[in-house]
Swiss-Prot record:
UniProt superkingdom: Archaea
Organism lineage: Archaea, Methanobacteriati, Methanobacteriota, Methanomada group, Methanococci
Known function: DNA-dependent RNA polymerase (RNAP) catalyzes the transcription of DNA into RNA using the four ribonucleoside triphosphates as substrates.
Cited InterPro entries: Arch_Rpo5/euc_Rpb5, RNA_pol_subH/Rpb5_C, RNA_pol_subH/Rpb5_CS, RPB5-like_sf
Cystines in this chain: none
The keyword Transferase belongs to this UniProt entry's keyword annotation: yes
Species of the source: Methanococcus maripaludis (strain C5 / ATCC BAA-1333)
Subunit text: Part of the RNA polymerase complex.
Entry similarity comment: Belongs to the archaeal Rpo5/eukaryotic RPB5 RNA polymerase subunit family.
Reactions accelerated catalytically: RNA(n) + a ribonucleoside 5'-triphosphate = RNA(n+1) + diphosphate
Broad class of the protein's primary localization: cytoplasm
Compartmental location: Cytoplasm
Enzyme Commission number(s): 2.7.7.6
Protein name: DNA-directed RNA polymerase subunit Rpo5
Gene responsible for this protein: rpo5
């Protein structure tokens, strides 16, 4: 079963690497300040993201409409 096919799971997409600096500049943050997501997360595996990728997560909210979050994929500790 694809995890992303469930209606409660928000859309996850990989941000192109060349767009990451623009994202960081827009929010005036450093890469390591983004919330983290482990490379073993089922959705990370499904979208084939690797450590260092940034995922754009788009959620629907009944009060705010569409909201966007960004997370940095990190490697699971050995």
């Amino acid at each position: 079963m694809k995890v992303s096919s469930h209606e409660m799971v928000p859309t996850h997409e990989i941000i192109p690497r060349e767009e990451i600096p623009l994202l960081l500049e827009k929010y005036d943050i450093k890469l390591q300040q983004l919330p983290k997501l482990l490379d073993t997360d089922p959705l990370v595996l499904e979208v084939e993201a690797t450590p260092g990728d940034v995922l754009k997560i788009t959620r629907m909210s009944p009060t705010a409409g569409e909201t966007t979050y960004y997370r940095l994929v990190i490697a699971t500790s050995p």
